[in-house]
Amino acid sequence: MMQDLRLILIIVGAIAIIALLVHGFWTSRKERSSMFRDRPLKRMKSKRDDDSYDEDVEDDEGVGEVRVHRVNHAPANAQEHEAARPSPQHQYQPPYASAQPRQPVQQPPEAQVPPQHAPRPAQPVQQPVYQPQPEQPLQQPVSPQVAPAPQPVHSAPQPAQQAFQPAEPVAAPQPEPVAEPAPVMDKPKRKEAVIIMNVAAHHGSELNGELLLNSIQQAGFIFGDMNIYHRHLSPDGSGPALFSLANMVKPGTFDPEMKDFTTPGVTIFMQVPSYGDELQNFKLMLQSAQHIADEVGGVVLDDQRRMMTPQKLREYQDIIREVKDANA
């Protein structure tokens, strides 16, 4: 907002200065044209004066005026007689005297003066007489008009320069050093995991309960805690549980009397770490899943219920090794 106000002040000050200069030139030309209109009448009356009086008239006309004198061939007695007469020149002096102070400061003689004297080819032209003394009073009427104008001009550019100070050329940005990549932190090793397999019927079918019960018992599972089947260290059910088998359908429990029972599949899971060698327990778990799938006519799936692949089996083994290393 302040910069907008400063720009407005600068523009207003410049317009004021231009208006003053145009007005001064216009006034000067107007006064000069009026002086040239009055001068022929004065010259007609000054022809009767002698050469000495003509020089006095030149002093009254101001700086840089060109005077044209006609050679006077009259007798000397006639000149003396004319010199005794009162000079009519003083009757026309006030108009010139009043017009001189209104001339502009340091106005050089323009080229318009010689064409006005051109119609008199037979008259000799004298050199212009420069009188510096009248210059001092000529500056007085002009100074009060020009002096107040520069005040807003000198005060306004100072904040304008300050406004453009931020526009200084900015040094080219130095290339930033490339940060070295931070060392990749090793993923923290897991200390426990759950290995999951599924035995499911083919698409659109279900596993028969009686057939499923026989295959589960043949694989060494025993019905126990949480109403699900567990595979213990010993086939007779003694020792710690190595892995367990649950129903794929929530809540995941079984009924031991499931002759009329059907299900889309069962889930076998093993918690790692576990008792004994986890890799050996995993092999036993995979063998049990394949035995049940073969007996009921199903397929073995991974934890995402996709077809089990050798890559997925290696992934399970890597997880088991990672947990073992973390708990070593």
From Swiss-Prot:
Cytoplasmic side: 28-328
Region Disordered, annotated ranges: 42-186
Chief location bin: membrane
Lineage: Bacteria, Pseudomonadati, Pseudomonadota, Gammaproteobacteria, Enterobacterales
GO terms under biological process: division septum assembly; FtsZ-dependent cytokinesis
Keyword Transmembrane part of the UniProt annotation: yes
Cellular component GO terms held in the UniProt record: cell division site; plasma membrane
Function: Essential cell division protein that stabilizes the FtsZ protofilaments by cross-linking them and that serves as a cytoplasmic membrane anchor for the Z ring. Also required for the recruitment to the septal ring of downstream cell division proteins.
Subunit structure: Interacts with FtsZ via their C-terminal domains.
Name the UniProt record assigns to this protein: Cell division protein ZipA
Subcellular location: Cell inner membrane
Acidic residues: bias regions: 51-63
Topology term for the membrane: Single-pass type I membrane protein
CDD domains recorded: ZipA (cd00231)
Domain of life: Bacteria
Organism: Shigella boydii serotype 4 (strain Sb227)
NCBIfam families: septum_zipA
TM stretches of this protein: 7-27
Pfam entry (one): ZipA_C
Periplasmic face residues: 1-6
Biased composition (Low complexity): 99-115, 123-171
InterPro entries reported for this sequence: Cell_div_ZipA, ZipA_FtsZ-bd_C, ZipA_FtsZ-bd_C_sf
